[in-house]
Regions:
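Non-catalytic interaction/Regulatory regions outside core domains
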Residues: 1-128
Length: 128
């Protein structure tokens, strides 16, 4: 299965995730949904917040797809959660990649997070 197939089928195909992307740990984009362009610098900042120190997110927020999100919480070393009005996003780090998924107004944050986290668990179990 290709990286794009994971985005299209495993994430967007659930109807619980409105937009998604998968990046390498260097910030390079492997695949993304149409119009959801997370810059390598944004992915790298998210990775730094997950693996090192999320405190800059408290004051500055988190930039994803050139949109500023309010930092909600983190699971150190694993994930961050953020929102922008009635929308939000979750980013989960695996051994070799970063999954970013967003939900839109009318979608449930917990359902979106669960889908992203389950795919991350699958990647981790398979060495990614």
């Amino acid at each position: 299965m290709s990286w794009q197939s994971f985005v299209d089928e495993s994430l967007l195909g659930t109807s619980q995730v409105a937009r998604a992307s998968i990046h390498g740990l260097d910030g390079k984009r492997y695949a993304s949904s149409a119009g959801f362009v997370v810059l390598p610098s944004e992915a790298q900042a998210i990775l730094n917040g997950i693996t090192k120190d999320p405190s800059p997110f408290y004051a500055k927020g988190i930039a994803i797809n050139r949109t500023k999100y309010v930092f909600v919480r983190s699971d150190p070393g694993h994930a961050i959660y953020c929102r922008n009005g009635n929308e939000g996003a979750v980013a989960v780090k695996t051994n070799k990649c970063l999954l970013i998924g967003g939900y839109s107004e009318g979608m449930q944050a917990g359902c979106c997070s669960s889908v992203i986290e389950k795919l991350a668990d699958y990647f981790i179990a398979n060495g990614y």
